UniProtKB/Swiss-Prot annotation:
Start-end of C4-type zinc fingers: 58-73
Keyword Disulfide bond in record: no
Source species: Synechococcus sp. (strain WH7803)
One Pfam family here: RecR_C
Tree of life domain: Bacteria
Gene Ontology terms, MF aspect: DNA binding; zinc ion binding
Gene name of the encoded protein: recR
Keywords recorded for this protein, A-Z: DNA damage, DNA recombination, DNA repair, Metal-binding, Zinc, Zinc-finger
Protein name: Recombination protein RecR
Residue ranges annotated for the Toprim domain, each copy included: 81-175
SUPFAM superfamilies, per the entry: Recombination protein RecR
InterPro entries per record: DNA_Rcmb_RecR, Rcmb_RecR, Rcmb_RecR_Znf, TOPRIM_dom, TOPRIM_RecR
NCBIfam families registered for this protein in UniProt: recR
Amino acid sequence: MSGFTRPLARLIDQFERLPGIGPRTAQRLALHLLRQPEEQIRSFADALLAARTEVGHCQTCHHLSAEPTCEICRNPERANGQICVVADSRDLLALERTREFSGHYHVLGGLISPMDGIGPDLLQISSLVKRVAANNTEEVILALTPSVEGDTTSLYVARLLKPFTRVSRIAYGLPVGSELEYADDVTLSRALEGRRAVE
């Protein structure tokens, strides 16, 4: 990277590796950090390391959590009869922003994608089936991205869960191939309200 000393170029390169950060934004972030007091930079670095070492996954739903069980699973006010299945925690957080869903979640950790070498065994599908079979789950709502991988995963999961419970999929006002986490709250609310049974 021309015009920058090696340590600064290295910092810019690290920022560019983050999703959604291009070269110009990476430069702005790096230059901004260099203008901050050393104490603030140390605090930033400590927070980053603490998040990496202290945040794991909930043993029940596999959402990000610093405890063995996440806040959502521990909340007694959540509806126990519904489980909303999402690909990752970003999708869970997007749905939580709508305040339309008061049940529990299950984070798969991705989508079935044979082209990328991701099969059902690499996802949290078997733990979902065990969870649904062991509990009195009235409905499983599949809230997976409308894509080939999302559809494949939805069909696979629905086939495994139908012997145990009702399975539905959220309605989509989203274009095929779009990502759930980028949808606005109104679209996500309507999608939850308009869900339908998986045939």
